[in-house]
Structures are given as structure tokens and as C-alpha cells.
């Protein structure tokens, strides 16, 4: 089996690709059913959106430019109109305090000695495509970070997850 490695593939293009992803494959396993496999993806939560923001800020230089901070109560007319205008321009509105919290988390990650070493030399958001030999099914995966290989050393592939707590016990519960 040989995988095709694609760097710099836009996120929307990756998600539109028809190959089977891990998250869709899980929907085929018991106790799931075909209807769940064919159902639309679940609605994204605020926590998922925050994790995506931290992910982008930590791994993708310049990602902040895709976000526009908007103050105020977004249900009121002026901020609501500003949010709509930002989205119409293809950008993401963000509350300033949410952006500040995400930036702090991304900075902590980048200055942590182990995390910084893992994210030192490589590429973010690397897409992999291959055909499963046993089934002939085309598959896909997206790695948060793919380190550049070093001769004679094991290749480590870090996966960034955000959680309320960094304690091993709490994170273990959240990550299952």
C-alpha cells in the first residue's frame, strides 16, 4: 500500500473529498447503522469551534488573519450586522475575549519544551490518501502535524487536542 501525501490542501477541499475518513468509518461500526453513516455531520459546538481556533493559531502561521474580532452582544443589531458582514466576506467573526484565550493556549503550547520540540520541524494539516488493499475502499486522513523525517529516528506524529483540563485523568475522560 502506498499513501499519497498532500501538503497545503485547503481544509474545505479535504472535507469534500469522497474517500472514507476515520470519523465516517466509526459510523459503520456497531452499534451504529447505515442511516447514521449517511446522516449529516453533527452540528459544531462552541467547544469544537474553540478547539479549531486554538489548533489553527498553534499550528498554522498567519491563521489569525482569517478571524475578525467583534465586541458586544451578537444578538443586538449592530454586532449582529457586523458578524453577518464578516461571514459574507468569507472570514470568521470572533469575540475578542475568546481570541485572547485561544492565543494564550497556543502560546503555552508553543513554549512548552516537549510540545515545541514535537512541532519544531514539519508541516501542519497534512492530508493522506490511500486505497485499503483488503476492501478496495479509498481512505483519507488528515494529520495535525507531520514532522520531517530524520534518518535513523522514529517518526513521531503529534495530534493536538484541547480540553478543559490538562490533568491526565480529566483529559483521558474527555478524549475517549
Q: What annotation goes with each model-predicted range?
A:
Residues 119-176:
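Mg2+/Mn2+-dependent nuclease catalytic core
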Residues 1-142:
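Metal-dependent nuclease catalytic cores that hydrolyze phosphodiester bonds in DNA/RNA
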